[in-house]
UniProtKB/Swiss-Prot annotation:
Domain of life of the organism encoding this protein: Bacteria
Protein known as: Uncharacterized protein Rv3067
UniProt key word Nucleotide-binding: no
Annotated InterPro entries: DUF732 (IPR007969)
Regions of compositional bias (Low complexity) in chain numbering: 7-19
Localization per Swiss-Prot or TrEMBL: Cell membrane
GO CC annotation: plasma membrane
Organism annotation: Mycobacterium tuberculosis (strain ATCC 25618 / H37Rv)
Stretches for region Disordered: 1-21, 70-99
Parts of the chain that traverse the membrane: 44-64
Length: 181
Protein backbone atom coordinates (compact mmCIF):
# COMPACT_ATOMS: atom_id res chain seq x y z
CA UNK A 1 0.00 0.00 0.00
CA UNK A 2 1.18 3.29 -0.98
CA UNK A 3 0.77 6.52 0.74
CA UNK A 4 -1.79 8.49 -1.09
CA UNK A 5 -2.80 12.05 -0.48
CA UNK A 6 -6.10 12.53 1.34
CA UNK A 7 -9.14 12.90 -0.92
CA UNK A 8 -11.15 15.12 1.39
CA UNK A 9 -11.83 18.50 -0.06
CA UNK A 10 -12.48 21.65 1.86
CA UNK A 11 -14.25 24.77 0.75
CA UNK A 12 -11.97 27.46 -0.40
CA UNK A 13 -12.11 30.64 1.60
CA UNK A 14 -13.69 33.56 -0.18
CA UNK A 15 -12.44 37.02 -0.01
CA UNK A 16 -15.79 38.82 0.09
CA UNK A 17 -18.44 37.84 2.63
CA UNK A 18 -22.08 37.77 1.49
CA UNK A 19 -24.24 40.43 3.08
CA UNK A 20 -26.43 39.09 5.88
CA UNK A 21 -30.12 39.92 5.66
CA UNK A 22 -32.02 40.07 8.93
CA UNK A 23 -35.62 39.44 7.93
CA UNK A 24 -36.73 38.72 11.48
CA UNK A 25 -36.63 42.38 12.41
CA UNK A 26 -39.05 43.33 9.64
CA UNK A 27 -41.79 41.06 10.96
CA UNK A 28 -41.36 41.41 14.67
CA UNK A 29 -44.61 41.94 16.51
CA UNK A 30 -44.49 43.43 19.88
CA UNK A 31 -46.72 41.63 22.35
CA UNK A 32 -49.26 43.76 24.10
CA UNK A 33 -49.18 43.52 27.80
CA UNK A 34 -52.41 42.25 29.33
CA UNK A 35 -53.11 42.30 32.98
CA UNK A 36 -54.25 39.19 34.80
CA UNK A 37 -57.59 40.86 35.30
CA UNK A 38 -58.19 40.99 31.53
CA UNK A 39 -57.05 37.39 31.07
CA UNK A 40 -59.31 36.07 33.84
CA UNK A 41 -62.21 38.18 32.55
CA UNK A 42 -61.85 36.67 29.06
CA UNK A 43 -61.66 33.16 30.52
CA UNK A 44 -64.77 33.77 32.62
CA UNK A 45 -66.68 35.08 29.58
CA UNK A 46 -65.77 32.01 27.50
CA UNK A 47 -66.69 29.69 30.36
CA UNK A 48 -70.07 31.42 30.77
CA UNK A 49 -70.83 31.09 27.06
CA UNK A 50 -69.88 27.38 27.13
CA UNK A 51 -72.04 26.68 30.17
CA UNK A 52 -74.95 28.55 28.56
CA UNK A 53 -74.72 26.48 25.37
CA UNK A 54 -74.51 23.27 27.40
CA UNK A 55 -77.57 24.27 29.43
CA UNK A 56 -79.52 25.03 26.24
CA UNK A 57 -78.65 21.61 24.82
CA UNK A 58 -79.69 19.83 28.02
CA UNK A 59 -82.93 21.81 28.23
CA UNK A 60 -83.79 20.94 24.62
CA UNK A 61 -83.05 17.27 25.17
CA UNK A 62 -85.08 17.17 28.37
CA UNK A 63 -88.03 18.90 26.70
CA UNK A 64 -88.06 16.50 23.75
CA UNK A 65 -87.50 13.39 25.85
CA UNK A 66 -90.27 14.14 28.34
CA UNK A 67 -93.02 15.31 26.00
CA UNK A 68 -96.58 14.43 27.01
CA UNK A 69 -99.07 12.99 24.48
CA UNK A 70 -101.49 15.87 25.02
CA UNK A 71 -98.93 18.39 23.77
CA UNK A 72 -99.05 19.36 20.08
CA UNK A 73 -96.50 17.60 17.93
CA UNK A 74 -96.15 14.68 20.33
CA UNK A 75 -98.64 12.38 18.62
CA UNK A 76 -97.27 9.03 17.61
CA UNK A 77 -97.10 8.35 13.92
CA UNK A 78 -99.79 5.92 12.84
CA UNK A 79 -98.66 2.59 11.43
CA UNK A 80 -98.89 2.18 7.66
CA UNK A 81 -102.14 0.76 6.41
CA UNK A 82 -100.44 -1.78 4.08
CA UNK A 83 -101.82 -5.27 3.74
CA UNK A 84 -98.44 -6.97 3.59
CA UNK A 85 -97.43 -6.38 7.20
CA UNK A 86 -95.41 -9.32 8.52
CA UNK A 87 -96.28 -9.10 12.22
CA UNK A 88 -99.73 -9.04 13.70
CA UNK A 89 -100.82 -5.81 15.36
CA UNK A 90 -100.95 -5.98 19.14
CA UNK A 91 -104.19 -4.13 19.78
CA UNK A 92 -107.16 -3.03 17.77
CA UNK A 93 -107.76 0.66 17.43
CA UNK A 94 -110.25 1.99 20.01
CA UNK A 95 -113.60 3.12 18.49
CA UNK A 96 -114.18 -0.18 16.65
CA UNK A 97 -116.33 -3.14 17.48
CA UNK A 98 -114.26 -6.00 18.92
CA UNK A 99 -115.05 -9.64 18.26
CA UNK A 100 -113.28 -12.59 16.67
CA UNK A 101 -116.57 -13.39 14.93
CA UNK A 102 -116.62 -9.91 13.38
CA UNK A 103 -113.08 -10.45 12.15
CA UNK A 104 -114.15 -13.68 10.43
CA UNK A 105 -117.17 -11.93 8.89
CA UNK A 106 -114.91 -9.09 7.71
CA UNK A 107 -112.41 -11.45 6.09
CA UNK A 108 -115.25 -13.40 4.45
CA UNK A 109 -116.80 -10.21 3.06
CA UNK A 110 -113.43 -9.15 1.64
CA UNK A 111 -113.06 -12.56 0.00
CA UNK A 112 -116.60 -12.32 -1.44
CA UNK A 113 -115.66 -8.97 -3.02
CA UNK A 114 -112.54 -10.50 -4.61
CA UNK A 115 -110.11 -8.77 -2.27
CA UNK A 116 -107.18 -11.00 -1.40
CA UNK A 117 -104.57 -10.45 1.29
CA UNK A 118 -101.41 -12.15 2.51
CA UNK A 119 -101.80 -11.47 6.23
CA UNK A 120 -105.32 -11.76 7.71
CA UNK A 121 -104.29 -10.04 10.96
CA UNK A 122 -102.98 -7.02 9.04
CA UNK A 123 -106.14 -6.93 6.91
CA UNK A 124 -108.29 -6.90 10.09
CA UNK A 125 -106.11 -4.22 11.66
CA UNK A 126 -106.33 -2.03 8.55
CA UNK A 127 -110.09 -2.49 8.47
CA UNK A 128 -110.31 -1.24 12.04
CA UNK A 129 -107.96 1.64 11.23
CA UNK A 130 -110.52 2.84 8.69
CA UNK A 131 -112.91 3.46 11.60
CA UNK A 132 -110.20 5.15 13.65
CA UNK A 133 -109.36 7.47 10.77
CA UNK A 134 -113.01 8.36 10.24
CA UNK A 135 -113.35 9.00 13.98
CA UNK A 136 -110.31 11.27 13.75
CA UNK A 137 -112.04 13.50 11.22
CA UNK A 138 -110.91 12.11 7.88
CA UNK A 139 -113.42 11.84 5.06
CA UNK A 140 -114.12 8.57 3.27
CA UNK A 141 -112.24 9.88 0.23
CA UNK A 142 -109.18 10.72 2.37
CA UNK A 143 -109.26 7.25 3.95
CA UNK A 144 -109.49 5.65 0.49
CA UNK A 145 -106.57 7.74 -0.80
CA UNK A 146 -104.43 6.93 2.25
CA UNK A 147 -105.15 3.21 1.88
CA UNK A 148 -104.40 3.33 -1.88
CA UNK A 149 -101.05 5.00 -1.27
CA UNK A 150 -100.02 2.51 1.42
CA UNK A 151 -101.49 -0.57 -0.31
CA UNK A 152 -101.29 -0.06 -4.07
CA UNK A 153 -102.08 -3.76 -4.62
CA UNK A 154 -105.72 -3.07 -3.72
CA UNK A 155 -106.07 -0.91 -6.82
CA UNK A 156 -109.69 -0.17 -7.75
CA UNK A 157 -110.97 -2.36 -4.90
CA UNK A 158 -109.83 0.11 -2.22
CA UNK A 159 -113.26 1.77 -1.98
CA UNK A 160 -114.87 -1.65 -1.53
CA UNK A 161 -112.34 -2.47 1.22
CA UNK A 162 -113.23 0.76 3.04
CA UNK A 163 -116.97 0.09 2.62
CA UNK A 164 -116.64 -3.45 4.04
CA UNK A 165 -114.58 -2.07 6.93
CA UNK A 166 -117.21 0.54 7.78
CA UNK A 167 -120.14 -1.86 7.53
CA UNK A 168 -118.37 -4.44 9.71
CA UNK A 169 -116.51 -2.47 12.36
CA UNK A 170 -118.15 0.95 12.57
CA UNK A 171 -121.68 0.88 11.13
CA UNK A 172 -122.33 4.29 12.68
CA UNK A 173 -120.45 5.71 9.65
CA UNK A 174 -122.69 3.96 7.06
CA UNK A 175 -124.25 7.32 6.22
CA UNK A 176 -120.91 8.73 4.96
CA UNK A 177 -120.46 5.96 2.39
CA UNK A 178 -121.11 6.95 -1.21
CA UNK A 179 -124.26 5.39 -2.70
CA UNK A 180 -123.74 1.96 -4.24
CA UNK A 181 -120.51 1.18 -2.41
Amino acid sequence: MRDEPPTDTAAAPTTGAAPEIDTAREYEVTAEYQSWRVVWGSAAALLTVGVGIGAAILLGWFTLAHRHPDQPGAAATPPPAGLTTRSAPTAAPPSTLQSPDLDSVFLGNLHDRGISFTNPDAAVYNGKMVCTNLGGGMTVQQVVEALQSSSPALGDRTTAYVAVSIRTYCPKYDAVLPPGS
